Amino acid sequence: MKFNEISEKLSPLVTNSSLTTHPDLNPDITAVAAVDEAVTGQLSYIEGGKFAAMVQKTAASALILPRDEALQAQATEKDIAWITTPEPRLLFAHAIKLFYQPFHPSPGIHPTAVIDSSVKLGKDIYIGPHVVIEQGVTIGDNACIHANVVIYPGVSIGDRTILHANCTIHERSQIGDNCVIHSGAAIGSEGFGFVPTPDGWFKMEQSGYVVLEDGVEIGCNSAVDRPAVGTTRVGRNTKIDNLVQVAHNCQISENCVFASQVGLAGGVKVGKRVILAGQVGVANQANIGDGVIASAQTGIPHDIAPGEIVSSSPAVPNKLYLKASAIYKRLPEMYQTLKRLQKKLEES
């Protein structure tokens, strides 16, 4: 595909993007690649900042650049075709779709699938080998159920939702349209509910529900647990990485992003557009406000106000954490200074 053809397809997708002003640079593009790995015939992108120097190092034939005249001049000097946009990474995400389409098998039901006679199947769905679908399940149009998926009784799955191989959807689960559940994930598994008694722990049955709203994505080997009563809910367009635990009764709002190994204890409430980086832990019943960002390995034992950026364990404002970290590095030097001052006081 010629670069100008790619530019024409991409330019309407991001506001205020502009085509290259060098019509003579119209290389053939056969693939996309990371900027430090790209070779002749490949398209990549640069967001600026610390990556700006990669313009001089890359072997890419074309780049998606920010609105930075210096970067554009460097690319032109190296005979690299370019298109500019305020959001290079977003435009590159669109570009990937021109060269790669995820595997989506043709509609049909594999003969080894076990499907109860009461199941309601939508149009043009795919059900792979050794899938098990129990009684009372409803599956929407154009859904894709890959090999070895198990769907428990009464589950509802929306249109165009994809269940990847070996995931499990337990009873009392409702999954919306355009969701993606990756391999090994468990949706609607029993919440961790036990009541102490003189004879040990009495199991509290988990009779509640799990709801994944439209556009939710759940990563490999993650779990969203159902509660004893009530509902565990994951809001619209929220994206959850691999190895994440969402406990019973959690309420997660729309457009959140959780990275790997995040753990939410029971009853946590998460506002809109919250970002939790890797290994963030949130304590029982904590409320996290809209727009909060928690850096990696933050421990959140209490409520966090909307818009806060927090770090460390227990969580503190990120600016305070950075100041404290800078001081921490100087503690040995400060300790020696303190010892000298103390000695002078004792001698005076």
Curated annotation (Swiss-Prot):
GO cellular component, one term: carboxysome
Protein's name according to its UniProt entry: UDP-3-O-acylglucosamine N-acyltransferase
Function, as annotated: Catalyzes the N-acylation of UDP-3-O-acylglucosamine using 3-hydroxyacyl-ACP as the acyl donor. Is involved in the biosynthesis of lipid A, a phosphorylated glycolipid that anchors the lipopolysaccharide to the outer membrane of the cell.
Pfam (any one): LpxD
Subunit structure: Homotrimer.
HAMAP family hit by this protein: LpxD
GO MF annotation, one: N-acyltransferase activity
Annotated GO biological process: lipid A biosynthetic process
Superkingdom per UniProt: Bacteria
Keyword Lipid biosynthesis carried by entry: yes
Signal peptide range: none
Species classification: Bacteria, Bacillati, Cyanobacteriota, Cyanophyceae, Oscillatoriophycideae
Active-site residues annotated for this sequence: H248
Reaction(s) the record says it catalyses: a UDP-3-O-[(3R)-3-hydroxyacyl]-alpha-D-glucosamine + a (3R)-hydroxyacyl-[ACP] = a UDP-2-N,3-O-bis[(3R)-3-hydroxyacyl]-alpha-D-glucosamine + holo-[ACP] + H(+)
Family stated for the protein in its record: Belongs to the transferase hexapeptide repeat family. LpxD subfamily.
EC number: 2.3.1.191
UniProt keyword Thylakoid present: no
Keywords: Acyltransferase, Lipid A biosynthesis, Lipid biosynthesis, Lipid metabolism, Repeat, Transferase
